Curated annotation (Swiss-Prot):
Alphabetized CDD domains for the sequence: EFh
SUPFAM superfamilies in the record: EF-hand
GO terms (BP aspect): actin filament bundle assembly; ruffle assembly
Statement: the UniProt record of this protein carries the keyword Calcium: yes
Gene3D superfamilies in UniProt: EF-hand
InterPro entries noted in UniProt: AIF-1_EF_pair (IPR049025), AIF1/AIF1L (IPR042433), EF-hand-dom_pair (IPR011992), EF_Hand_1_Ca_BS (IPR018247), EF_hand_dom (IPR002048)
Sorted UniProt keywords: Calcium, Metal-binding, Repeat
Highest taxon, organism lineage: Eukaryota
Limits of the EF-hand domain: 38-73, 74-109
Binding, Ca(2+): D51, N53, S55, D57, E62
Gene designation per UniProt: cbpB
Organism of origin: Dictyostelium discoideum (Social amoeba)
Protein name: Calcium-binding protein B
GO MF terms, alphabetically ordered: actin filament binding; calcium ion binding
PROSITE patterns xref list: EF_HAND_1, EF_HAND_2
Length: 140
């Protein structure tokens, strides 16, 4: 008896990510006149990393995980209030348009400050390879 279980979910996930990325690109195109390509790309990457289930929205659960990741755990009501400050659709989740507006400062919120704080906390990439030669005159 053949099993009808689809073991190729990796392909489905890849397609889902590709579709989400194309949707986010089309939304980012709306902001192309206001922001440069590098900034929009950075926001898209951030949004995709926060949107764990690839639904196109950051919901309460995903925001809770983000806050716990940066050691700022919040209650359900605090998370709900943070989302309400940014949410323009009334769905109770942050879509990519709201995320860009929040990050560009068009809607100031505590969530914007927390996300910027998280970016500052990331370690910069260390140079790899052999260190450059220095002379005594280079020392402070």
């Amino acid at each position: 008896m053949a099993s009808k279980v689809d073991y190729q979910s990796g392909k489905k996930h890849g397609l889902q990510l590709k579709n989400q990325e194309s949707e986010l690109d089309s939304i980012a195109a709306e902001f192309a006149g206001e922001l440069d390509e590098a900034t929009l790309s950075k926001y898209k990457t951030q949004f995709m990393s926060y949107d764990i289930n690839n639904s196109g929205d950051i919901d309460h659960y995903e925001l809770q995980l983000l806050m716990e990741k940066i050691n700022q755990p919040k209650t359900y009501l605090e998370l709900k209030k943070m989302i309400e400050q940014v949410d323009s659709t009334g769905k109770g989740a942050i879509n990519f348009r709201d995320f860009i507006k929040m990050m560009t400062g068009k809607t100031s919120s505590i969530l914007q400050k927390i996300l910027m704080f998280e970016e500052m906390g990331k370690k910069s990439e260390q140079p790899k390879g052999i260190p450059q030669k220095r002379s005594i005159s280079d020392l402070p």
